Amino acid sequence: MDIKGALNRIVNQLDLTTEEMQAVMRQIMTGQCTDAQIGAFLMGMRMKSETIDEIVGAVAVMRELADGVQLPTLKHVVDVVGTGGDGANIFNVSSAASFVVAAAGGKVAKHGNRAVSGKSGSADLLEAAGIYLELTSEQVARCIDTVGVGFMFAQVHHKAMKYAAGPRRELGLRTLFNMLGPLTNPAGVRHQVVGVFTQELCKPLAEVLKRLGSEHVLVVHSRDGLDEFSLAAATHIAELKDGEVREYEVRPEDFGIKSQTLMGLEVDSPQASLELIRDALGRRKTEAGQKAAELIVMNAGPALYAADLATSLHEGIQLAHDALHTGLAREKMDELVAFTAVYREENAQ
């Protein structure tokens, strides 16, 4: 099926099969479609509402065309990632949580990009910290193996995305591609915490990842709108484990964490996000730093559980608390800065 045939189906509110979606995505991602066709396709899909089959097909093609990162093992390797678009503009929680996970003994294959609608994307934050982003796949793999955390810059590993960049920018609306980023980790991780911008996506995306071979995944959305675990409200979870998806909710109090507002955690730049994270991972001299530390732990703990390094969310959160409060997480951030600095010099030659 070509994109014109797909458009004809979509305007008649007919779904595509996984194979049909793969065919259309290959055309888009190899430069065979015009911007008008891509824009019409994305809006048509959104108006119709994307099915699990369609998302599976789109993800499969993006993974196929990605510049992958080969790791010696995927056991205990996890990604902590969100779709973004929650409008909260709080600091980069998932990036900070990644250093805590690494400090607790996990391996983090972090996939991310620059900010689209927010004030600070994961790439923006890490760049502000002095971490070199333009790494080859082999260099990323060494970071993960040696430091315990490595960052895969989406625009480096998903070069075919350039064909959809123009239409996405001109539309200025959430489209299918907002869902695809967290599902297309270049290292092929099978353990993830995926934050989404609406609760309605939790179970469908867990089912998508089940179809694509994931092993232990938490797809989450908090009641206050965050695409991650929150301190201020209950968080809805669709958990994929042992081949089954189940849904439930948790609150901070379930883990001995005080429920509190997110006031003071908003940032207006990557530098502001970095300063808050350094305080949270360091001596926590400010009230905001103390609160940020709690939120980081609330998100790092589930990642340790998803990585099967903890037998429960409660145990994962305790491990994360210990890793943060010993200062090891801050050391991991500094270690990644130093480790990637060597590659900055190598790649400049």
UniProtKB/Swiss-Prot annotation:
Mg(2+) 1 binds at residues 94, 228. One of its GO terms (biological process) is L-tryptophan biosynthetic process. Pfam families: Glycos_trans_3N (PF02885), Glycos_transf_3 (PF00591). It comes from the Bacteria. Pathway: Amino-acid biosynthesis; L-tryptophan biosynthesis; L-tryptophan from chorismate: step 2/5. The keyword Transferase applies. Keywords: Amino-acid biosynthesis, Aromatic amino acid biosynthesis, Glycosyltransferase, Magnesium, Metal-binding, Transferase, Tryptophan biosynthesis. Binds 2 magnesium ions per monomer. The keyword Signal does not apply. GO terms for molecular function: anthranilate phosphoribosyltransferase activity; magnesium ion binding. GO terms for cellular component: cytosol. InterPro entries: Anthranilate_Pribosyl_Tfrase, Glycosyl_Trfase_fam3, Glycosyl_Trfase_fam3_N_dom, Glycosyl_Trfase_fam3_N_dom_sf, Nuc_phospho_transferase. Anthranilate 2 binds at residue 168. Anthranilate 1 binds at residues 82, 113. Its cofactor is Mg(2+). It catalyses: N-(5-phospho-beta-D-ribosyl)anthranilate + diphosphate = 5-phospho-alpha-D-ribose 1-diphosphate + anthranilate. Its EC number is 2.4.2.18. It is an enzyme of class 2 (transferase). Catalyzes the transfer of the phosphoribosyl group of 5-phosphorylribose-1-pyrophosphate (PRPP) to anthranilate to yield N-(5'-phosphoribosyl)-anthranilate (PRA). Homodimer. This is Anthranilate phosphoribosyltransferase. The lineage of its organism: Bacteria, Pseudomonadati, Pseudomonadota, Gammaproteobacteria, Pseudomonadales. The gene is trpD.
